[in-house]
């Protein structure tokens, strides 16, 4: 697969939130191919697995959001190769974002695990910040990872659906629906609390990764190896 992404030029949606339109090509059929991998993964989730791990719990709901780890769970060459393009494009946009906000570069050291997120109607997300944490089902303590996030990077793969637009709680702006192939970066804290409008049809798909100030403690709590955690360091 040839290079599918371009550097592009950042546009500002609001202070702190920037996006790059047409930053990566979405080949015909790739979303359907990746979605099939997600669906094949879902059917093997048991109730016991869901009770032990929040990721599996989300996976058993029909309409999602399904948070699928593409690094470990993509099995086909097509999906793996395209995901590598997503990673390269994301790192380029992170570098550009840090040029816009030089202090951000001083605060980021690690990346969380990637997520490939899909969901279908009538799903919507209520207002939340990306620093919001929930309790670990196994320990009863709040997961620490979300508290360490500095900004979140989303790659929107499709726009052939109604609804599903971003809305920010504290900014008087209309809902924003990024076009397919758009990368968006937003700060993680409460000032950028956001929701999505209800998804009315179709199946929304995006890649997401959080960029953090400290090592990936959430993965450590869920049993990740030191080698897996160390490789997420930003050098």
Can you name each region flagged by the protein language model?
Residues 1-183, 191-235:
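Fe(II)/2-oxoglutarate oxygenase catalytic core
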């Amino acid at each position: 697969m040839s290079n599918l992404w371009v550097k592009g030029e950042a546009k500002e949606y609001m202070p702190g939130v920037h996006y790059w339109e047409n930053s990566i090509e979405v080949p015909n059929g790739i979303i359907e191919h990746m979605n099939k991998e997600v669906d094949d993964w879902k059917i093997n989730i048991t109730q016991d697995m869901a009770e032990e791990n929040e990721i599996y719990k989300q996976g058993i709901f029909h309409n999602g959001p399904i948070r699928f780890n593409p690094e470990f769970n993509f099995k086909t060459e097509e999906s793996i190769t395209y995901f590598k393009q997503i990673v390269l494009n994301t790192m380029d946009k992170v570098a550009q974002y840090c040029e816009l906000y030089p202090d951000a570069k001083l605060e980021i050291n690690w990346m969380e695990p990637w997520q490939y997120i899909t969901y279908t109607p009538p799903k919507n997300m209520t207002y939340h910040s990306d620093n919001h944490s929930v309790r670990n089902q196994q320990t009863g303590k709040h997961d620490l990872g979300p508290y360490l996030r500095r900004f979140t990077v989303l790659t929107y793969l499709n726009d052939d659906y109604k609804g599903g637009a971003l809305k920010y709680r504290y900014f008087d702006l209309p809902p924003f629906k990024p076009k397919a192939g758009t990368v968006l970066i937003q700060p993680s804290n409460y000032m950028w609390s956001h929701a999505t409008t209800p998804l009315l049809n179709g199946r929304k798909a995006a890649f997401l990764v959080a960029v953090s100030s400290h090592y990936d403690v959430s993965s450590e709590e869920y049993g990740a190896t030191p080698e897996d955690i160390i490789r997420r360091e930003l050098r």
